[in-house]
Amino acid sequence: MSGKPVIHEFIVVEGRDDTTAINRSVIADTIETNGSALSQETIEKIRHAQELRGVIIFTDPDFPGEKIRKQIDSAVPGCKHAFINRQDALPKAGRGLGVEHASSANIREALENFHTSGAPTEKQFISKDILVHLGLLGGVGAKERREKIGNILKIGYTNGKQLQTRLESFAISEEQLVAACQKIMQEEENE
């Protein structure tokens, strides 16, 4: 017995090195996109996997990874999303950013804290005014706060334009957002 958790869903990753990292961390089947140019064949494979057992999209926390995530989510509704923090996806040496650099513990944590996109039963709406008031849009430190919010809420990093949509997509309530911001403010005061 390996002691590794078993993931029922198929995990969609970008490449072979990501599959290796997943296999060292959990027992799961993966589907590799092999780059950001998603073929129709890959989309069909993901669609079939979603129908069979469900899919968790687990791409790198960078622009190409986010592009792949959006393409899949658009073509195959109802997918689950796992996010790895940017700092956990940095290599020990050299350049790059990716799932393949994350520790087994970080990979397991990301897969345990997935979100499901789609139409939530009760649509959450958080106005831009609230996002500005919480220091997440415009102003000094907004980018850093958005990155921290993404880590706390396990929704990944988003830029200012994407934040409201991401919060709605994963049905994050205003109360959850405010609580996460209070945690960040507490950390900033303690620094």
Swiss-Prot record:
Molecular function as annotated in GO: metal ion binding; ribonuclease M5 activity; rRNA binding
Catalytic activity: Endonucleolytic cleavage of RNA, removing 21 and 42 nucleotides, respectively, from the 5'- and 3'-termini of a 5S-rRNA precursor
Domain of life: Bacteria
Cofactor binding note from Swiss-Prot or TrEMBL: Binds two Mg(2+) per subunit.
Record carries keyword Metal-binding: yes
Cofactor: Mg(2+)
Keywords, sorted A to Z: Cytoplasm, Endonuclease, Hydrolase, Magnesium, Metal-binding, Nuclease, Ribosome biogenesis, RNA-binding, rRNA processing, rRNA-binding
InterPro entries assigned: RNase_M5, RNase_M5_C, TOPRIM_dom, TOPRIM_RNase_M5-like
The protein's Enzyme Commission number: 3.1.26.8
CDD domains: TOPRIM_RNase_M5_like
Residues annotated for Mg(2+) 1 binding in this entry: E14, D60
Domain Toprim: 8-91
Subcellular localization, as worded in the UniProt entry: Cytoplasm
GO cellular component, one term: cytoplasm
Top-level EC class as recorded in UniProt: hydrolase
GO biological process: rRNA processing
Family that this chain belongs to: Belongs to the ribonuclease M5 family.
UniProt function note: Required for correct processing of both the 5' and 3' ends of 5S rRNA precursor. Cleaves both sides of a double-stranded region yielding mature 5S rRNA in one step.
NCBIfam families with a match to the protein in the record: 5S_RNA_mat_M5
Protein name per its UniProtKB record: Ribonuclease M5
Native source organism of the sequence: Listeria monocytogenes serovar 1/2a (strain ATCC BAA-679 / EGD-e)
